[in-house]
């Protein structure tokens, strides 16, 4: 993976153009931007190929029933775009690609003169298989809990089994981060997450095991972006609550380890660019052709409940249903993530 960094400001129209030279043997591009200015938000306006053709613009994906990427939505002080997402979005032709980042205020009005830092990463095409490197951290003193560590180790095997048919394997290395067991809100992000991500290699996805997330026992896990960034940023991580996955007694049994493994794969899938095949409004779907566009809860649970990216686990008082399936189009999105190499 080749990493390049810039700093700059948005122009009078609220845009900052990032030009990335893609080599002939490279097939994926990840651009992430962030700003430290208060009341400023980042999103991707558009991406253009070396001939100047618009490959994607936000207007085509903002107010439609399908979701391609979270990059176009101004939801925080950082944003990331991985390109291409689908087969029809590619290939990534060699030459200079231009990604236009937009800076806006909390009224969604463009702002000029906003300072931002940008990282662009490209990868050499790995073929039909690849590896996602994971920097795994335990918050607080959780690494000293042997039963928890053993449960996480088993859950990682479940995650690996879910991803194995996609051709993507995972390589896990344990790292240390300075975060308390109650993890900060990852959707809001912040300096604590930036500092944590700075402890990892620029090619690794940071995954942090905490007890709770922002005080909640109802959140199984969160991804800081769809997709997320590999370099340090205010949301460049995946957060996992072991307590939410372990159930009321806080002790992992076999079914709860399965749930934890499904959660790890689900949130890492978001980080690599996968969206839910259907949102729980039953009125919005992913942009992939081989997932059902069901329109009612009962139909969606029949069609998609075993899918790893279904928006929620299906549980009764004794156990949760396995959610380990991924379609070929979903698998291809994983393989196109720049962090898979």
Placement of each model-derived feature along the sequence:
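Acidic, Ser/Thr/Pro-rich low-complexity intrinsically disordered segments
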Residues: 5-63
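A short alpha-helix/helix-coil micro-patch that ends at or immediately precedes a cysteine
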Residues: 139, 144-173
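The catalytic-center signature of Zn2+-dependent metalloproteases
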Residues: 250-332
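Active-site-proximal segments of metallohydrolase catalytic domains
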Residues: 167-255
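Stable alpha-helical elements in mature extracytoplasmic
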Residues: 148-155, 189, 260-264, 330-333
């Amino acid at each position: 993976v080749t990493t390049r960094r810039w700093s700059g400001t948005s122009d009078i129209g609220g845009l900052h153009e990032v030009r990335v030279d893609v080599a002939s043997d490279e097939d994926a591009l990840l651009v992430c931007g962030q700003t430290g200015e208060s009341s400023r938000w980042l999103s991707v306006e558009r991406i253009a190929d070396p001939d100047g053709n618009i490959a994607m613009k936000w207007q085509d994906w903002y107010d439609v029933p399908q979701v391609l990427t979270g990059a176009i939505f101004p939801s925080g002080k950082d944003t990331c775009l991985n390109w291409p997402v689908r087969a029809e979005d590619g290939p990534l032709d060699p030459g200079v690609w231009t990604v236009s980042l937009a800076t806006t205020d909390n009224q969604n009005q463009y702002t000029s003169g906003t300072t931002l830092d940008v990282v662009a990463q490209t990868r050499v095409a790995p073929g039909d298989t690849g590896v996602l490197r994971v920097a795994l951290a335990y918050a607080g003193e959780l690494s000293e809990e042997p039963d928890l560590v053993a449960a996480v180790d088993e859950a990682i095997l479940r995650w690996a089994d879910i991803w194995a048919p996609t051709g993507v394997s995972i390589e896990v290395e344990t790292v240390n981060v300075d975060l308390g067991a109650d993890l900060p809100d990852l959707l809001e992000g912040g300096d604590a997450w930036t500092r944590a991500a700075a402890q990892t290699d620029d090619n690794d996805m940071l995954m942090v095991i905490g007890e709770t997330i922002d005080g909640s026992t109802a959140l199984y896990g969160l991804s800081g972006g769809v997709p997320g960034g590999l370099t340090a940023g205010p949301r460049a991580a995946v957060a996992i609550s072991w307590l939410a996955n372990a159930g009321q007694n806080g002790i992992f049994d076999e079914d709860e380890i399965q749930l934890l493994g499904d959660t790890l794969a689900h949130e890492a899938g978001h980080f690599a660019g996968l969206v839910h095949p259907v949102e729980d409004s039953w009125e919005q779907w992913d942009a992939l052709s081989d997932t059902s566009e069901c329109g009612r809860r009962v139909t969606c649970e029949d069609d998609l409940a075993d899918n790893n990216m279904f928006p929620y686990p299906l549980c009764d008082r004794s156990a949760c249903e396995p959610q380990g399936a991924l379609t070929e189009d979903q698998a291809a999105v994983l393989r196109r993530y720049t962090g898979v190499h």
